[in-house]
Amino acid sequence: MSLQPDTLLELSPLLRMQWEEAQQRYVILYPEGMIELNETAAAILELCDGQHNLTSIVDKLERKYDASGIEPDVREMLESALNNGWIREIIAY
C-alpha cells in the first residue's frame, strides 16, 4: 500500500503502544502478543496520533534529531506499519 504524504495517520485502535520497563523499550501490544520497537520506530509511531501525516512526521523528526533527508526511511517504516496493520490512514470527508 502506498502512503500519501498528506493523509493523517493513527495507531490502530486494536493496538496499544507503551513503554515496557522489563524490555527497556517501547512495545506494541496486541491481543496475541507484543512487538518490541527500536527507538527510531517508537519515535515515528508516537507521532501517528491522528494529527500528523508523513510530511509533518518527517518535519518534526528532522527538527528533533537535527537530521535531513530522512523521508525515504520514514516512509518505508510507515508503509510497513500500514501494511502490518499497526497504523491506519484517516480519510477526511
Curated annotation (Swiss-Prot):
Listed InterPro entries: PQQD (IPR008792), PqqD_bac (IPR022479), PqqD_sf (IPR041881)
The molecular function terms in GO held by this entry are: quinone binding
Pathway in which the depicted protein is active: Cofactor biosynthesis; pyrroloquinoline quinone biosynthesis
Q: Which GO terms describe its biological process?
A: pyrroloquinoline quinone biosynthetic process
Q: Which domain of life is it from?
A: Bacteria
Q: Which UniProt keywords apply?
A: PQQ biosynthesis
Tell me, how does this one assemble? Monomer. Interacts with PqqE.
HAMAP family per record: PQQ_syn_PqqD
The entry assigns this protein to a family as follows:
Belongs to the PqqD family.
What is the protein's known function? Functions as a PqqA binding protein and presents PqqA to PqqE, in the pyrroloquinoline quinone (PQQ) biosynthetic pathway.
Q: State the protein's name.
A: PqqA binding protein
